[in-house]
């Protein structure tokens, strides 16, 4: 086989349908758009969620909730992820970022209690769950809220 003998797989290449090119083509005159009406016009068509003039569902339902502008989003770290550090290490948010445990600092770091911790660490974070704090101290480590 040579480069000039290469051919596409059968059925993988289709010829484009040229609409509006004479009635003999089967797609002439109205070009598959039917007669008149909104969908026959250029740029015609209804917007997403349009229900033919009936009040759409998104307007029938009441508004609900709000966005708290003071919301804090914490970078979450579970206990089992802290086992990558050596015994006696002081774990800080900067160190977590450097080691790739978290990708972004966000509003701070929160330590959660999923998994086991086998190392004795001093963990500095912005928040701790009760179970995480308990587990770190049970392993002989310390927790410090910054």
From Swiss-Prot:
<dbReference type="InterPro" id="IPR030878">
    <property type="entry name" value="Ribosomal_uL15"/>
</dbReference>
<dbReference type="GO" id="GO:0006412">
    <property type="term" value="P:translation"/>
</dbReference>
<comment type="subunit">
    <text>Part of the 50S ribosomal subunit.</text>
</comment>
<keyword id="KW-0689">Ribosomal protein</keyword>
<feature type="region of interest" description="Disordered">
    <location>
        <begin position="1"/>
        <end position="46"/>
    </location>
</feature>
<dbReference type="InterPro" id="IPR001196">
    <property type="entry name" value="Ribosomal_uL15_CS"/>
</dbReference>
<comment type="function">
    <text>Binds to the 23S rRNA.</text>
</comment>
<feature type="compositionally biased region" description="Gly residues">
    <location>
        <begin position="21"/>
        <end position="31"/>
    </location>
</feature>
<dbReference type="GO" id="GO:0003735">
    <property type="term" value="F:structural constituent of ribosome"/>
</dbReference>
<dbReference type="GO" id="GO:0022625">
    <property type="term" value="C:cytosolic large ribosomal subunit"/>
</dbReference>
<protein>
    <recommendedName>
        <fullName>Large ribosomal subunit protein uL15</fullName>
    </recommendedName>
</protein>
<keyword id="KW-0699">rRNA-binding</keyword>
<dbReference type="InterPro" id="IPR036227">
    <property type="entry name" value="Ribosomal_uL15/eL18_sf"/>
</dbReference>
<comment type="similarity">
    <text>Belongs to the universal ribosomal protein uL15 family.</text>
</comment>
<dbReference type="Pfam" id="PF00828">
    <property type="entry name" value="Ribosomal_L27A"/>
</dbReference>
<dbReference type="InterPro" id="IPR021131">
    <property type="entry name" value="Ribosomal_uL15/eL18"/>
</dbReference>
<dbReference type="InterPro" id="IPR005749">
    <property type="entry name" value="Ribosomal_uL15_bac-type"/>
</dbReference>
<keyword id="KW-0687">Ribonucleoprotein</keyword>
<keyword id="KW-0694">RNA-binding</keyword>
<dbReference type="GO" id="GO:0019843">
    <property type="term" value="F:rRNA binding"/>
</dbReference>
């Amino acid at each position: 086989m040579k480069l000039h003998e290469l051919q596409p797989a059968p059925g993988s290449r289709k010829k484009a349908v040229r609409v509006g090119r004479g009635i003999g083509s089967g797609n002439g005159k109205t070009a598959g758009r039917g007669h008149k009406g909104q969908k026959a016009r250029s740029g015609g068509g209804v917007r997403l969620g349009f229900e033919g003039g009936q009040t759409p569902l998104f307007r029938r339902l009441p508004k609900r909730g709000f966005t708290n502008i003071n919301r804090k989003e914490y970078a979450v770290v579970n206990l089992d992820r802290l086992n990558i550090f050596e015994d006696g290490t002081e774990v800080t948010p900067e160190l977590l970022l450097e080691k790739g445990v978290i990708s972004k600092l966000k509003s701070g770091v929160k330590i959660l209690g999923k998994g086991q911790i086998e190392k004795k660490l001093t963990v500095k974070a912005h928040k701790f769950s009760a179970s995480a704090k308990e587990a770190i101290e049970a392993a002989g480590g310390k927790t410090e809220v910054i």
